[in-house]
Design a protein with these regions (language model features):
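Catalytic cores of DNA base-excision repair glycosylases
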Residues: 1-197
């Protein structure tokens, strides 16, 4: 993998926050198809906070869970204005106070925008970490803890993106591409099975 960075398109911390929230249970490719119109209509939290549910819904209706995401986007924008002066906060704990923002989203924003030494664990990071042997954790929190302990602070952001991309394109959920994986010699699952899962 040449570049370990987000595949989501964005031009500001606020727009990355929108994109990451929309990406839950949806592909980055689909989110990127819709974000140009969303970003043009909502350049800042003010415009989004003032928008109607129907207006937001129409822009995101082909993204998974549009009802919840539309409500959360409007609430999130309002809280950014009321609690954070319209700025996206840098601390994960503050980010998690925003509607629709959980630990994974908070860690993505803190890492990508503010270079905080945190690792966001999504389905790809969880799967790859357990398969290759970086963690034996049975839940997201345990895997995050293991990865945080296992990677130096300055590499955690890159590790997060590398694990995501490796999970999307090589160590896929179904039919992983073990034969073309550069980690065969290091991979616990490959060593145990000596074949694809």
């Amino acid at each position: 993998m040449e570049r370990a960075e987000s595949e989501l398109h964005y031009d500001s911390p606020f727009h990355l926050l929108i994109a990451v929230i929309l990406s839950a249970q949806c592909t980055d490719k689909r989110v990127n198809m819709h974000t140009p119109q969303i970003f043009a209509r909502f350049p800042s939290p003010k415009e989004l906070a003032e928008a109607s549910f129907d207006e937001v819904y129409q822009l995101i209706k082909s993204i998974s869970f549009p009802n919840n995401k539309a409500m959360h986007r409007i609430g999130m924008a309002g809280k950014l204005i009321s609690d954070f002066g319209g700025e996206v906060p840098s601390e994960p704990a503050q980010l998690e106070t925003l509607p629709g923002v959980g630990r994974k989203t908070a860690n993505v924003i803190a890492s990508v925008i503010y270079d905080k030494p945190v690792i966001a664990v999504d389905t790809h990071v969880f799967r790859v970490s357990r398969r290759i042997g970086l963690s034996d954790g049975s839940n997201v929190e345990a895997v995050e803890s293991d990865l945080t302990a296992g990677f130096p602070a300055h590499l955690r952001g890159k590790a997060h993106h590398w694990l995501i991309l490796h999970g999307r394109y090589v160590c896929t959920a179904r039919k992983p591409k073990c034969e073309s994986c550069g980690l065969q010699d290091l991979c616990r699952e490959y060593r145990l099975n000596n074949l694809c899962l």
